[in-house]
C-alpha cells in the first residue's frame, strides 16, 4: 500500500496518459496496470492528436482511477501556479504533480523555481508531488516548503536509461527514510523499475516506457508486476553481495577427505 498525504492507495505504480496510439489502448493499459493514479496535463494534446476535451475526460473517468493533474510544459512559477489552479477546477482535485522545467534539452527540473511554486501551492491547499532531481539539498528544501512526498527522476524524461545516478538515489533514500519517494522519469524497462523498488523507493511513475512500447497493454502489465516484485524483494530483505563464495548446502556429514586436516 502506498501512502501519500495520509491517503492510502492499493498500488505503487502511477501511470501517465500521454502519447498512446489510441484512446482504447490507453484505457486497456490503465485497466491492466491498475495504477494508484493516472497523470494528465491541461497543456498537452490527447491520444491520437485530439485535444483534451469532454471525450478524453470521460475516458479517464471510465477507468475509475484517481486523476493526478500535472503542470507539464511550465517554465515559470506563475505559469505553474496558474496551471495548477486551472487543473483543480477542471479535475476537481487538490492533487497536483508539480513540474517546472529549467532546460529544454534535458527537461531537467528548475529546483529553485520548484521550491517557490511548491510553497505557494501548498499554502493554497494543494497536495503537491514535485518532479525533482535526486539532489539531496534540493529535496530537503522541497520538504521544508511543505511537500510530504517527492518525485525524483531516474534519468531525463523519455530516455529510458534507468537510474543513471544510482549512488545519489540511494543516498537520497537513506537520508530521507520517512519521506515517500516515487521515481519519476527515465525508466525504460520493467527490470529498471524493479531495481529502484528493491532499493526501497515507494513507487514508480511511468509514461513513455509504456505508451511508446510495441504493446502498451502488455508492457503496462509487465511494469505492474515488476513494481510489485521489487517491493516484495525489498520487504523480504535481500541477501548482501559477497566477494567470496559461500556454499548454500550444509557441510554436516561430508566425506572425511574434504576436511581441512586430510
From Swiss-Prot:
Protein name (Swiss-Prot/TrEMBL): Thiazole synthase
Subcellular compartments: Cytoplasm
Gene3D superfamilies: Aldolase class I
Reactions accelerated catalytically: [ThiS sulfur-carrier protein]-C-terminal-Gly-aminoethanethioate + 2-iminoacetate + 1-deoxy-D-xylulose 5-phosphate = [ThiS sulfur-carrier protein]-C-terminal Gly-Gly + 2-[(2R,5Z)-2-carboxy-4-methylthiazol-5(2H)-ylidene]ethyl phosphate + 2 H2O + H(+)
Enzyme Commission number: 2.8.1.10
Active-site residue numbers: 97
Keywords assigned: Cytoplasm, Schiff base, Thiamine biosynthesis, Transferase
Single annotated GO MF: thiazole synthase activity
General function of this protein: Catalyzes the rearrangement of 1-deoxy-D-xylulose 5-phosphate (DXP) to produce the thiazole phosphate moiety of thiamine. Sulfur is provided by the thiocarboxylate moiety of the carrier protein ThiS. In vitro, sulfur can be provided by H(2)S.
Residue span of region Disordered: 243-262
Binding annotation for 1-deoxy-D-xylulose 5-phosphate: 158, 185-186, 207-208
InterPro entries, per database record: Aldolase_TIM (IPR013785), Thiazole_synthase_ThiG (IPR033983), ThiG (IPR008867)
Subunit structure: Homotetramer. Forms heterodimers with either ThiH or ThiS.
Organism: Neisseria meningitidis serogroup A / serotype 4A (strain DSM 15465 / Z2491)
CDD domains: ThiG
Pathway(s) it belongs to: Cofactor biosynthesis; thiamine diphosphate biosynthesis
Alphabetical GO biological process terms: thiamine diphosphate biosynthetic process
Keyword Cytoplasm found: yes
Superkingdom: Bacteria
Stated family: Belongs to the ThiG family.
Keyword Transferase listed: yes
One term under GO cellular component: cytoplasm
